[in-house]
Curated annotation (Swiss-Prot):
Subunit structure: Homodimer and heterodimers.
Subcellular location: Cell membrane
Membrane topology reported for the UniProt record: Multi-pass membrane protein
Residue ranges that the UniProt entry lists as topological domain Cytoplasmic: 1-18, 83-113, 178-193
Keyword Transmembrane: yes
Protein name, UniProt field: CASP-like protein 2U1
Highest taxon in the source lineage: Eukaryota
Ranges in the topological domain labelled Extracellular: 40-61, 135-156
Organism (species): Sorghum bicolor (Sorghum)
Residue stretches spanning the membrane: 19-39, 62-82, 114-134, 157-177
Coiled-coil features, chain-numbered ranges: none
N-terminal signal peptide: none
Amino acid sequence: MAMALALGGGQDAERKVKVAEVALRALLCGLGALAAALVATDTQTRTFFSLQKKASYTDMKAMVFLVDAAAVAAGYSLLQLAARCCGGGAMSSGRGDGGGRGRALSWCVFSCDQALAYVLLAAVAAALQASVVAKRGQPELQWMGICALYGAFCRQAGAGLATAVVAGLAAVLLAFLSAFNLFRLYGSGGTKS
């Protein structure tokens, strides 16, 4: 209710919320796909004394988790966009039939959006931590940083991580919007017994 009042109230506020949701889902879809593609295609081969060593994102399990989470985020957002645009909006707003089915769908979307935000943020945090170790090393354990040796690999991984951070922020905003869409169904403005 407070968000609707802040947006101007009435039908105009409803339209703004729907536009914001579609925009966030489209942004998350694009950024998730871009982050997954940047990290998944990241490889670099170096030759050391006639031995070829290849750095790949699969060498760090946190990066594999990030690729998986970003790809799932992109796919889920694409499915939600299709349902939102083709299904008339009942999937997200919960107002499709005015009753229990709409609320059940809203709870499902809310739960999935929350889970997606948590998983994507966990993947980003793990990948950032692994990247710091890759960049700086861990002197206490005598681990050296590898970014001096695999510069192109680290730059592309950094671009993928930056994209994933923005995708994670979009997922958090989408989770907030999903919570708003759900809990406004239980608002005090004219609930029927």
